[in-house]
């Protein structure tokens, strides 16, 4: 099993933590990660685009001129697609772009991105992230002590609200619970800052 250094909030190394190789030590499957990222990005699309077809455009109920005898081309409505102000043919309609991949694929993708972060030395383990009250300055001190100055995803245990509130005003810092972090969240971050309890949660969820 792989070992990573465990730090406290002051940046001091206190011990090491053992990681489960079945989750944090596999060969990353880039193809699966790609598929899951595309799926999750598709689910984020709003999908509210809409245009009016000829049945939705107002007006045009009357035939503009008689069928025969005028010398002009026959027309049934001034809201036909060939008219200015007419309906749009085959235009976009509101829809959901989301689709689900099998659970096995999603789990493999999570294991792959966690393993990649550990292999690239972009996985920082911290004993805990506990604050007496939501304080952005206190969270900034923790990041500085751990020499984290890039885009970071902080994974905390369920119920640690003060950590999330303390970090939300900091640029390039995102907070998620260990059980709900997505592949897209992890891929978007340069580094992961994970509490010891969150590591246990990840291993429980993906075991």
From Swiss-Prot:
GO biological process, any: translation
A GO term, aspect molecular function: structural constituent of ribosome
GO CC terms, sorted: ribonucleoprotein complex; ribosome
Region named Disordered: 49-78
Entry keywords, A to Z: Ribonucleoprotein, Ribosomal protein, RNA-binding, rRNA-binding
Annotated transmembrane regions: none
Keyword Secreted: no
A UniProt-annotated Pfam family: Ribosomal_L4
Family annotation (Gene3D superfamilies): 3.40.1370.10
Assembly and interaction partners: Part of the 50S ribosomal subunit.
Function: One of the primary rRNA binding proteins, this protein initially binds near the 5'-end of the 23S rRNA. It is important during the early stages of 50S assembly. It makes multiple contacts with different domains of the 23S rRNA in the assembled 50S subunit and ribosome. Forms part of the polypeptide exit tunnel.
HAMAP family named in the record: Ribosomal_uL4_B
Protein name: Large ribosomal subunit protein uL4
Organism from which the protein derives: Streptococcus equi subsp. zooepidemicus (strain H70)
Underlying gene: rplD
């Amino acid at each position: 099993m792989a070992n990573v250094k465990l730090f406290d909030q002051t940046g001091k190394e206190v011990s090491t933590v053992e990681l489960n190789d079945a989750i944090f030590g596999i060969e990353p499957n880039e193809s699966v990660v790609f598929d899951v990222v595309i799926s999750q990005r598709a689910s984020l699309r709003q999908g509210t685009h809409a245009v009016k077809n000829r049945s939705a455009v107002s007006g045009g109920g009357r035939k503009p001129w008689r069928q025969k005898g005028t010398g002009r081309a026959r027309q049934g409505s001034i809201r036909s697609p060939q008219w200015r102000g007419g309906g749009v043919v085959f235009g976009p309609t509101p829809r959901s772009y989301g689709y689900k991949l099998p659970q096995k694929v999603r789990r493999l993708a999570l294991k792959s991105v966690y393993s990649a972060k550990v292999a690239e030395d972009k996985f920082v383990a911290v004993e805990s992230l506990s604050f007496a009250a939501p304080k952005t300055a206190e969270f900034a001190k923790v990041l500085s002590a751990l020499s984290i100055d890039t885009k970071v995803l902080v994974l905390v245990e369920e119920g640690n609200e003060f950590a999330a509130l303390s970090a939300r005003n900091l640029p390039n810092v995102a907070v998620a619970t260990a059980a709900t972090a997505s592949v897209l969240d992890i891929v978007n971050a340069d580094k992961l800052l994970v509490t010891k309890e969150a590591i246990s949660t990840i291993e429980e969820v993906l075991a």
